From Swiss-Prot:
Residues 42-87, 141-168 are annotated as: Disordered. This is UDP-N-acetylmuramoyl-L-alanyl-D-glutamate--2,6-diaminopimelate ligase MurE homolog, chloroplastic. The lineage of its organism: Eukaryota, Viridiplantae, Streptophyta, Embryophyta, Tracheophyta. It comes from Arabidopsis thaliana (Mouse-ear cress). GO terms for cellular component: chloroplast; chloroplast nucleoid. It is found in: Plastid, Chloroplast. NCBIfam families: murE, PRK00139.1-4. Involved in chloroplast biogenesis. Required for thylakoid membrane development. Seems to be required for plastid-encoded plastid RNA polymerase (PEP)-dependent gene expression.
Amino acid sequence: MAFTFLSPHPVFLSLTGTTSSFSYKPVLLPFSRNSRTLTVAAGPARRNSYPNPADDDPPEAPEDSMHGVSKFQQIQRQAARARKLEEEDFEKNRNTYLSAIADVEDAAETGRDDEESGGDLFSDIDRAISMKRSEFVKQGLLKPNPPKTASLKKIGEEGNEEEGDVTDDVDELDEEEVVDLDEIDKLTGLTEISDEEDWVDEEGNTRINKKKEFGSDHQFEFDLDDFGESKARIVEPKFKMCLAELLDESKVVPISVYGDLDVEITGIQHDSRGVSAGDLFVCCLGSENFLSEADKRGAVAVVASKEIDIEDTLGCRALVIVEDTNAVLAALASSFYRHPSKNMSVIGVTGTDGKTTTTYLIKSLYEAMGVRTGMFSTVSCYIHGDNKLDTPNATMNPDAVLVQSLMAKMLHNGTESLVMEASPQELALGKCDEVDFDIAVFTNLTRENTDFRGTDEEYRDAEAKLFSRMVDPERHRKVVNIDDPNAAFFVQQGNPNVPVVTFAMENTKADVHPLKFELSLFETQVLVNTPQGILEISSGLLGRHNIYNILAAVAVGIAVGAPLEDIVRGVEEVDAVPGRCELIDEEQAFGVIVDHANTPDGLSRLLDSIRELKPRRIITVIGCEGENERGKRPLMTKIATEKSDVTMLTSDNPRNEDPLDILDDMLSGIGWTMQEYLKHGEHDYYPPLANGHRLFLHDIRRVAVRCAVAMGEEGDMVVVAGKGHEAYQLEGEKKEFYDDREECREALQYVDELHQAGIDTSEFPWRLPESH
């Protein structure tokens, strides 16, 4: 089925913000091309949060634009602006500056030798101030200072009387140094302030003791854990609600209730390990054994399913029995955190592949429009901007409580929009049931690279749950990849009158499609056709599959009426996505990428995409995890050796399994055994495979990665697959830090030195010069 534009009203906002007549309200209201104020349209419940900019005066254009201006010209402008501001500041505070240097001794007319100064920084500063003062004296702006010997002596004596005796082992300051230090303390505000009392300054004004006002008992106590990666202040919101109010707000109808429904709830958890005093513990099926642990940790109330046997010894103050706790968990969490998604514009991205990269691109696009945008993906969680939260295992296994609590934290810290992955697994389990999505994005649908348990129809229906919520033509949008054969099914979900923006690489009838693209080892260039004009994009994201992700993000920008220049800038800002075909660039002559592909299908598609970049050779490092999916080990080797010129087998989280046993299983993919491989190694030479490709192995991953990188030559592409963004290695019971990306960067520092030393790294083991 072919689509041109699937919206019933195929009209978009123009680049200048003017619109043709249309009957629906866009997700983003029209705004000036030069404006950086973005307002997200909303239904009635959202209008108070996002005022209409049409009610205000039109925004003023900036003084100058940096579009098309070189970096050097930008720096020139900034320097000129800084000089102008400095001159204005001097004129404004002229008297203050003059009085500040009035007490400095006049500088001697003759300069001092460098040897005499001894390189003393403070002497240099004093001399500079004195020279400046002398200049003002010559200009008649200041009067010469009278001799200060008498006054200094008097002040010094007073200071000595107040200080009392000084211990012998401490060097005494001379009188002038004491005065200077006192004045410095006073000028810089370093004089001691009482922890208890306010004080009165020299002018008679009462000053508030900030240490007393914002002491250790203040609610904003300093804690590095409260800071994002960029060290912006991240404030943890506090919530509380009585149990009866929570049940009423969430519309949960209990089967029976015991205890005090007026008990105050200060948190909600369904994992007993995270319970704190005052929390409500929602005991889901399968976690009944953790009731006692939750009780010991201070849970004041419990919500449990009727199938669970509740012990009489529980010390909680209230017990609520419901039909199914899994069904009510999302509603309870959303109500407790005050429905945060209703006050943000939320973009959900579903599909089998491309979700993570697409979320990164959309986040960057929104921020290019001036919108504070959070992100929730399998790789990272961002409040907004580069304020990254450290949430170990949270993003990999999100639950309804975590989703709502993170959204509440984002909203509390000024986030205006949120882009999040909505995987079929999460949608099927109801983890996103209480998220109020505004835009639904569909990337693609395959079953080869997923852990979803169910039929193909169930898998497709799970993804379609996101689109079934697109019912409001004024607020909702659908963004669909029509190269996928399931596109029509997703378009038909929800209200058919909701506008749809389509994208594709093969179907030129899509609203967003490439007119031309060029792939290389280091960048991707694509010319994109859109209803609003043609975009020229240069991206550091490599491969054909990333063009799909770029098109999806562009389609979202078109759907919300974003200015074209913001779309381009937002997409181009994303140079790499952690562990997703991530380019490691140390200015070497060959490419190195790290990717998370750890399944036969994922590895096959990755290597096909790399081959399309036309490298001279592909050198692939791959391993298989221990105690997990032994059946895929031969397949991984077979695919790697068929689609790579050189393959290096290694370990990947062996756990309690012998790495050599894992490698033996992998070698069976080419009909070899470990004994046969080692027999070849007796002569330090491993013959080519039947297809002419080479195969090596090493059970230590760090060694394998560094050797593969050292093999790289101009025009090659080294592919390190399996871990991606994961920064650990599981060996036995130990979890040790390890990062493929850091190992690649480290190895690249020595490649030139190895080659200059005459070491032949094309073979394994390496050949020293004398053995060539």
